[in-house]
Amino acid sequence: MENRALDPGTRDSYGATSHLPNKGALAKVKNNFKDLMSKLTEGQYVLCRWTDGLYYLGKIKRVSSSKQSCLVTFEDNSKYWVLWKDIQHAGVPGEEPKCNICLGKTSGPLNEILICGKCGLGYHQQCHIPIAGSADQPLLTPWFCRRCIFALAVRKGGALKKGAIARTLQAVKMVLSYQPEELEWDSPHRTNQQQCYCYCGGPGEWYLRMLQCYRCRQWFHEACTQCLNEPMMFGDRFYLFFCSVCNQGPEYIERLPLRWVDVVHLALYNLGVQSKKKYFDFEEILAFVNHHWELLQLGKLTSTPVTDRGPHLLNALNSYKSRFLCGKEIKKKKCIFRLRIRVPPNPPGKLLPDKGLLPNENSASSELRKRGKSKPGLLPHEFQQQKRRVYRRKRSKFLLEDAIPSSDFTSAWSTNHHLASIFDFTLDEIQSLKSASSGQTFFSDVDSTDAASTSGSASTSLSYDSRWTVGSRKRKLAAKAYMPLRAKRWAAELDGRCPSDSSAEGASVPERPDEGIDSHTFESISEDDSSLSHLKSSITNYFGAAGRLACGEKYQVLARRVTPEGKVQYLVEWEGTTPY
C-alpha cells in the first residue's frame, strides 16, 4: 500500500478560508439551478454520475421538476431516476457563449468565459470551482471544466496518477464544490439527505467501494481517489484514510491489519453482493479468498501457505458464532455458511489513532507541509514517537483482548456488551439477546471464550422449597450483596451442621460460604438483624436457578417428581452452557 505523507497541518475543517468555494457562486448555482436544468429535454443524451463515481451514457425519458430528476435509460436498457446535479449535458453548437453557473454573457479582466474542450459549456473564471487560471494553476489548452476533469480521470480501481489530467484532478480535489456543513447525516454518519459525497459531489453507497476520511468523516469513491495501489473489495473499511482537503495535499492512506475472522467476513460479504445468495459452501469461500489473496492486502498473513489457509478460515467460521451462521443450525449441510447480519466487517477502532494526537493547523510543524510522496519518517519527530507509542499500546491491547474474547452470544447473556467493547461492532451488527437482563449487570467467568461452541445444555434440579443450588457459572455479587464479616464467621461455624441437597446431576453445594449458602443455614440466626435478612434474600435470589431466572435465561421443564419427604422437584434444562 502506498503511503503519502500525512500533512502536519491536518485540520478539523475543510481547508483554509481562501480555499473554500465562493459562496456567491454557490448562491448563483442555487438561484439558476431550475433555469439551467430546464434545458434537459426528453430524448437528450447525457452523462450520468453513478454511485461508484463513474459516468455512464444514458438517454432522458422523462423530466420531473418536482423531483428535480430525470428518468434515464442506460445502454443495458435499465432505467433509473437521476438527480439533476448528477447529470452532465453538452453545450449547443453555435450558441452564444455564456456562463453555465451565473448564466451571464459578459466577460471582464481575469473573469473571461472559458469554453470546456469536452462538453462545450462555458464558465466564468471566477464562477468555476476552483477559480480557473489562478497564478498557481495556469490554464491548460484545451481547458476542461471540473465535471469533465472527473469524467476524464476517474477509473475503476482508482483515478489517474500520472499526466496533465491527473495533476489537474489533484488541484481540483483540493476544493469541494459544496458546503459539507450543510449536509444532513444519519447518526452513524454513513448517508446524507442530499446524496452528496466525495470530491465530485455525486451519489454513493458507503457499503460498496468507498473510503471514509478519518478527519472529516466524508465518504469518497474508490474511482476518485489517487492513493490506491490495488482495487478495493466491497465493504472493505480496513484503511486509515485522509482526503486531499483535510491533508492539504495528496491523500494519505494506510492499510490496517486483518485477522482471519475479518478475512472470511469480508469474503462472505463480497460473495453475497456479487451473487445475491445467502449460503456459500466452504470450498467456494476458500476459492474466493485464494483468488483475491493479493487484493486483500493481508500484511503479515500474506505469507500463509495455501495449504494452511483453509483450516484458519474454517476455524474462524466455527468459532465466531456471533458473525456467522452454519447450515447445521437450521438443519442444512454443515459445510455451508452465511453472515448472520449482512453488513461489512467493522475495522477495530483500537488500531486507529486518537484524533487529538493529530497535529493541528497552528502547530509549529505546519511549516513542514509536504505536497508529494514522502515516507512516514519525514513527519515531525515528536509526533512520530507519540504516534508509535499509542499505536503499539492500542495494538497490544487489541491482540490481548482478541486472544481472550467473550463467549458466544448464543450461549451467554453478557456477550452483547463484551463483543461491542472488543470488536467495535455497531448496534446494527449485533443481534440483541431476547433473554438479556433488564436491569442488573452480570459478568461471565473468565474462562469463557468466543471460540467456545459447545452445543450441550445444563440440566439442574430446581427444588420447590427454595433449596437453590449454585449456578453453573461463577458470578460476582453486587456491592450491596457482599457478606458482612460477622455473617461469614457464623456461616463458617454452621456450615458443617447444614445439610444440602444435591442436584439431578449429582453436583453438591460448595462448602465455601462465599460461593453458595443453603437457605436453611440462616434458620438458627436471629431474623432481627436486618443486614442478615437482606443478605439471605440477596444470596437466594442471586445464586443458582433464581439468578438465572432473574437474568432472563431461557429454560425448559423436562420432568417433575415428589420426594418421600413430600417435596416437589423439577428437572430443568437451561439454554446456557456449563463447563462442568
From Swiss-Prot:
GO terms for molecular function: chromatin binding; DNA binding; histone H3K36me3 reader activity; histone H3K4me3 reader activity; methylated histone binding; zinc ion binding. CDD domains: PHD1_PHF19, PHD2_PHF19, Tudor_PHF19. Changing W50C: Abolishes histone H3K36me3-binding and recruitment of the PRC2 complex and RIOX1. Gene3D superfamilies: 2.30.30.140, 3.90.980.20, Zinc/RING finger domain, C3HC4 (zinc finger). Coiled coil: none annotated. Residues 531-580 are annotated as: Interaction with SUZ12. The modification Phosphoserine is found at S13, S187, S365, S366. Residues 351-360 have a biased composition (Low complexity). Residues 74-80 are annotated as: Histone H3K36me3 binding. Its main location: nucleus. Polycomb group (PcG) protein that specifically binds histone H3 trimethylated at 'Lys-36' (H3K36me3) and recruits the PRC2 complex, thus enhancing PRC2 H3K27me3 methylation activity. Probably involved in the transition from an active state to a repressed state in embryonic stem cells: acts by binding to H3K36me3, a mark for transcriptional activation, and recruiting H3K36me3 histone demethylases RIOX1 or KDM2B, leading to demethylation of H3K36 and recruitment of the PRC2 complex that mediates H3K27me3 methylation, followed by de novo silencing. This is PHD finger protein 19. It comes from Homo sapiens (Human).
